[in-house]
Amino acid sequence: MARTATGNEKRTALAGHHHVPLHGEKQTGPTDPNAELAVTLLLRRRHELPELHTALGGKHPQQRRHLSREALAQKHGARSDDIARVSRFARRHKLDLHEIAPHRRSVVLSGKASAIEHAFGIRLVEVEHARGKYRAALGKPTVPVELAGIVHAVLGLNTRPCAKRPKPHRQHAVEPFWTVPEMARAYGFPDTLGGAKQRIALIELGGGYYKQDLQKFFSSLQRPMPSIRSVAVDGARNSPASPDQLQQFFDVLHGRRKLSEVPADVLAAAQATMEVTMDIELAAALAPGADIVVYIAPNTEQGIYNAVSRELSGKEKLPCALSISWGEPETEVSRAYLKSVDSLLRDAAMLGVTVCVSSGDEGAMNGATDGKPRVNFPASSPHALSCGGSTVHASRGRDVRESAWNCVLYGMRGATGGGVSRRFPTPPWQKKHGVPLSPNGRKGRGVPDVAGPADPRRGCAILVGGRRCSSVGTSAVAPLWAALVACLNQELGARCGYIAPLLYNLAASDTNALRQITKGNNGFYQAGPGWNACTGLGSPRLEHLLEALRVAP
């Protein structure tokens, strides 16, 4: 039991908040004590959620009983007396109550950095790394004993970027392999207005898009402009890279300019813009009847948590799917953060929202320096649909041949992320599918669950900055599956929601709902029959998947 340096207040440490330093990380000095900061406190639930596999897992979508937002907030939101205790704590430490959201189980406190340090018994420092400049908290955060068990996490002390993107290098120009309508036909998407009356939320970390790109893109498809709008989170907004920044980025890709000549912030802005635009164009083109909402949040743990939380708890139409095209190795983040986001994804499952997450683009090793493979989070959450990548070798109508994606990408090797989690145990629905032991010798959650086209040499035509480009990476697969879920929900008249258990059940019964991908590797794991750690259960055959779900008991 600790005590503050200025009094006899008994305190307890918050579990799982260790700072995991990155290789090459360098501290440059203390955070300005007068800097104004905001942190998000995540509180315990009024009542715990039921075990999801029992409540939802094996049931047909039309048999599932999802919670409404109101029921989730009333039964599983924060307690009023817990919020009162946090409010008293904030006043004692001269922190402002910036936002109180019992339905989201969160309280946002703001104040000077020195007050934040004193309130939580930590030291804030500034850090430089190849990923950029950010803030880190040294020491374990503590809270008064009366908040023990009430405050589960404090987000915002650390501002390290969540999404990491590979540096582009010179390569030959990549021409798109096919158009969106061609890809849609290959994977069985309907020719009609798929996804009608559905809502897809895209979670983006920085960057933005140009409306004129979207208008030209859909005009080229001879389609009307879909319903697309952006939502700003925590000060972030739709901020696409400038035309000059995009020009420098494409000059690097096409060998007209050296990488060393382009500032890192220019590359980051251009890559983020390409990512956001790609997500929108693919999701909206594959499910043209759906409303697309783009949440643009800061590239931090706090930013991503707040974006997902606000969409799930909002007052507008509940989304059928969330698409998250980012990730970082689960071994590089705190356990408190893992548990916090995983808890949000459990909320999504109970609400009937499918969360599609890209598995990563750096293969099984995923930038590891210890020689051991590692998987990305939140793709490793058992409550996410983890989306891996394939290379399409041929497509004649709906006859598609694929292998696990593993190629040279922008001068670097790009490959589908996949492996076995070191943080999450094997979920019940994966136990009979041959998931190997994790690198630490334990049973873990296998990644990915499914796959889709990720190889830029066989990518889909998109439009960014007025330029025709090829879709790239597992970031392109998450919006594809989100669009697929929108089409399924429309046709079934019910929410698929927590869809992974359904897909594994279908795979076990040998249906044609998924196309197995049995060739290729991701640098450590080999593709093969059944589930594999490169492409999961395989790529979709939407029409067969819909038929299987309609007749499932």
Segments the model singles out, each with a brief description of its role:
Residues 401-406, 410:
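Phosphate/diphosphate-binding glycine-rich loops and adjacent basic-rich segments that engage nucleotide
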Residues 366-370, 396, 511:
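Short, glycine- and charge-enriched coil/turn segments that flank and shape catalytic ligand pockets
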Residues 104-106:
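A generic structural signal for beta-strand entry/edge sites
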Residues 378, 405, 429, 462, ...:
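Short clusters of hydrophobic/aromatic residues that line enzyme substrate/ligand-binding pockets
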Residues 476-489:
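Active-site-proximal alpha-helical segments within enzyme catalytic domains
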Residues 2-99, 108, 113-389, 412-417, ...:
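Substrate-binding/charge-relay-adjacent region of secreted/lumenal peptidase catalytic domains
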Residues 395, 494-553:
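Extracellular low-complexity, O-glycosylation-prone Ser/Thr/Pro/Gly-rich "stalks"
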Residues 394-400:
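Short acidic, Gly/Pro-enriched loop/turn segments at secondary-structure junctions
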